[in-house]
Amino acid sequence: MNLMSHMIQRQLGLDPPLTRDLVIERDLPVPMPDGTVLLADRWAPRAGGDKLPVALMRSPYGRGALITAGMVRPLAERGFQVILQSARGTFGSGGAFEPMRNEREDGLATLEWVVKQPWFGDSIVLVGPSYLGYVQWAVADRLPPEVKAMIPQVTDSALTLDFLRADAYSLETPFGWGVMIAGQERRLGMLRGLLEERKTRRAMSTLPLGEADVTAIGRHSGYIQDILQHDADDPYWAAIDHRSRVADVSVPVSSVGGWYDIFLPGQLRDFAVLQQAGRNARLTVGPWTHLSMDGTMMREALEFGLACARGAEPPPRGPVRLYVMGEEAWRDFESWPPPGYSPRPFYLGSEGTLAVEPPAADPPSGSPAAGQPADLAPDRYRYDPADPTPAIGGVRMVRSGAGRVDNTPLEARPDVLTYTTAPLESDVEVVGEVSAQIWFRSSLPDADVFVRLCDVDADGKSWNVCDGLTSLSAADQVTAATVRLWPTAHRFKAGHRIRVQVSSGSFPRYARNPGTGEPRATAASLLAADQSVYHDPGHPSAITLPVRSPGAEGTEDAS
């Protein structure tokens, strides 16, 4: 057994392999309809490998030690033969790599090739995370009968588009990915790319932003220029958007995601579409970032994928399995979003308070401030894009500093407002979609509103749960900014406090708003802005949480 793979498999907690003796056929030519030849490797048990179910992975990241040790070898040692193919224009495959644009045609042609091979039996399972999951959606509505299941992990059917929303432009992930892809075929390219995150971050501070790729890699990148110049609703992206195919999937689908994953909203959208269409689908969401998955992903490929490939039923469980943070336990539900959770607003108030009662002109009778006039003045802060509010934890595709972290240092900044409840008398469980409406005004027309939900523990540490950002183009007038936060499943325990942060950025996760109204790719100057957050009876700023009702489903411990 490969030593690196052995160490990874132990860390993932996988069952012992069925065999350690594998045969590897490298650089198998796979012809495409246009004459381009893609290369693939086949991994299979030396004894009895022919006719086993095929796990098909199509990847732009090569066929080297990192991907084979962590994904290919574990499957090939436990009941699959694995085909790992390099996407067009990458790692020996012919043609030019145009991110996401050729995956439908190439994927369908590859499936046709697999079923014609002498070692093929009767079943294929599509499996893989991120880009390797996206390519599954690209062919999902035209699968041949030999495909028995899909297991897309930390991915969605439109991949890039959620980052490029005009009202919430997420810079770090697509830019960082573009930089990584541009240099990955250098010696140790992917590893070097991960280690050069600091250089990439500095590049994202370049003005104008359209020159940031030159700062990072020494030349312009077609993909990076595309993400800077085309918003999500631009027809330019139509060919990479496979959301319309999701409802037409005919095979069982098991989706695996993370609460701090970059693709979570789209992945949950895809799952909801499958459920609404009556498809055989199940969902698993854990406390992970994009780069911090545990063995759940591989176990799902083995338990669910092999069962479907053999015509058997996977081990029984609920259609939706969620890790409820705070409780730190797995729970099963029947659907997403689960029933039994009702929207409850928590209102921002004066002196940094957060409460279920809306703001009133005078404090309620019986309160310590009864009989005194309420402080209804807006809270103010100054946002300077030259010293932007930093991204701390949360939804980021970085090696460290993502996911749940203590936000106390961030909340000490003068450009971050916080609103906090009193210590909770009982647990508050939140599962589902989270949104906020913040009454806001800026000294400039163009401004951003970033909202983060946190859990403040008994020691006073503030742990981020979920967050989101929206961009405004008429912010110099008092306006209700609607912010869509990441979905979540979290239990705020008795004695803890619920906190809401409000600021105007999270850089470099989201691009800086220069305040000038110029296009993001060409803006060459930065303007500081004075921001106001209102919380009076006429402007009731609030975050709305899906709070569990008494007797709601999902009480079964799935651990």
Tell where the protein language model's regions lie, with residue ranges.
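A catalytic-pocket lid/entrance helix-loop region that shapes and gates access to the active site
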Residues: 127, 134-198, 259-262, 277-308
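Short beta-strand/loop motif that positions the catalytic acidic residue
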Residues: 249, 255-257
